[in-house]
Each structure stands twice: as C-alpha cells, then as structure tokens.
Regions:
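N-terminal regions that are enriched for targeting/export leaders
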Residues: 2, 8-60
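Contiguous N-terminal and early-domain "leader" segments and peripheral loops that mark the onset or edge
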Residues: 3-5, 12, 97-98, 104
Length: 246
C-alpha cells in the first residue's frame, strides 16, 4: 500500500512524522505540552500506516472471518474515534468529513448510534482505501491544528491519550487479522518477504529457573496512562517456575 502521500501537511508545525470500545482512563494527569502530545499523536498514527505499508489495497479490504476486520476498517475506525470524540467536542466549526462515516466506522459505541454489522465489514468495498486514507489525513491535520496551542485542555488531552491507546490496540488487531487472512491464502503469501538468513546451529534450549514470591500486578493511579481494567495495583503469590531460554 502506498502511504507516501498520507502523512498530513499542517500549517504552523514542524513535524517528524478488540474492536470493542476501550475503557475510559481512570484519571487525568496534568496536561503535557502541546508539542509533546503532537509528537506522540504523529508517532502512533504513523506506526499504524507503517504496519499497512506491505499490504495491497486488496489485502486491506478483505475480511477472513466474522471475528476479524479488514485493515481498511481498522484505519477508518481509529480515525473516526478522533473525529467523533476529539474534533466534534473541541474543534470550532467542525463539520464531519462524511456524515455516513458514523454508521460505517462505529464499532460498539451504543450511545453514538447504529452501526454496520461486524461480520459484514468485508462487504464495504466503498468507500475505497484511497478515500479512507484521505479521511485519515484530513482528521490528523485537524487534530494537529487543535494542538497548535501552548496549552492543551485537560479534557482534550485525556481524550487523545485514550484515543492513542485505542489506536495501539487496533495496531495489534491489524497484525493478528492480517496473519489470519494471509494464512487462509493457498499461495501462502508473506506479510514481509525476507531473504533467508544463513543457516546456523540453534542455541541449545535450556530452562532458566526463577524464584517465586509475592509480586505486584496492575497499575497505580498516578501520571502514567492505564485502563480501568488494569487497576488496582495488587499483590499476588507467584510460585517458583522456569522459563525457556528461547
């Protein structure tokens, strides 16, 4: 997939570029500087496009099973999150890129309204992948315009933090869904074709013993982002065990 023209060009900036709804963050930390948030936004959004770079438009449109989603849908859904929850709430005079997209790209956000059925996402040959990438670049540019300010409101910072964690979830889903899709192809295509490495003896497998004991699991309620399902920080007993060296 050619993504060379999908990185948004936005004035006034110098930039280095579960389908289920993600839980809300449990706290709002002091807002980071706008430039830091903009860099984080660009890094996460660019990483999603990088995952799609080896894929053809046909790869991005196919759905291998009802429990998977097309890559094109993942690209659009992550973009829709930022348009619906960040731009619509915080951008002045915001107009939807396409009003029909609320129906196409919503997943399970009941309060937003009806949505296209998940098992039928692979039937969405229209809009095209090119149109979805245009949508993505348009929304990215508008989000970065919002961040062209010395201070980011806490509510916007919290929404963007949640949206970026949500996008990272969909990066994982893109990889797993593409793996299932390509595995179903009798031609056995590779996601990344690599030159085979020179043969070398395998390092012997050994078990590395690890002591057990009382361990801390979960997240604390402080600066770092976490989902509510990761709280509270709690203690658990871990039995002694061993891990394979490779």
């Amino acid at each position: 997939m050619d993504v060379s023209r999908t990185t948004p060009t936005v004035p006034r900036h110098s930039r280095n570029a579960l389908a289920a709804p993600a839980p809300r963050p449990t706290r709002t930390a002091e807002s980071p500087p706008a430039a830091v948030l903009a860099q984080r936004f660009l890094a996460v959004r660019s990483a999603t496009l990088a995952l799609c770079a080896p894929l053809s438009p046909e790869d991005c449109a196919a759905q291998s099973m009802p429990d998977a989603s097309p890559v094109k849908w993942h690209l659009a859904h992550g973009t829709w999150f930022f348009e619906h929850f960040a731009l619509a709430a915080h951008a002045r005079r915001h107009a939807p890129f396409d009003p029909a997209f609320d129906y196409l790209w919503n997943s399970y956000y009941e309060a937003v309204g009806p949505r296209h059925a998940r098992p039928s996402r692979g039937l969405l040959t229209r809009p095209s992948l090119a149109r979805v990438l245009e949508y993505r670049a348009h929304v990215d540019a508008q989000v970065l315009d919002l961040l062209d300010a010395p201070v980011v409101p806490d509510a916007l910072a919290a929404t963007l933090a949640l949206g970026l964690a949500h996008e990272e979830q969909h990066q994982e889903l893109i990889v797993t869904d593409v793996k299932h899709l390509l595995a179903a192809n009798p031609l056995q295509p590779a996601y990344h074709a690599r030159t085979p490495a020179a043969g070398a003896p395998a390092v012997p497998l050994r078990l590395v013993p690890r002591g057990g004991g009382l361990v801390a699991i979960g997240a604390e309620d402080h600066d770092e982002f976490c989902f509510d399902a990761e709280q509270p920080l709690h203690r658990a007993w871990l039995e002694p065990h061993a891990l394979a060296s490779r």
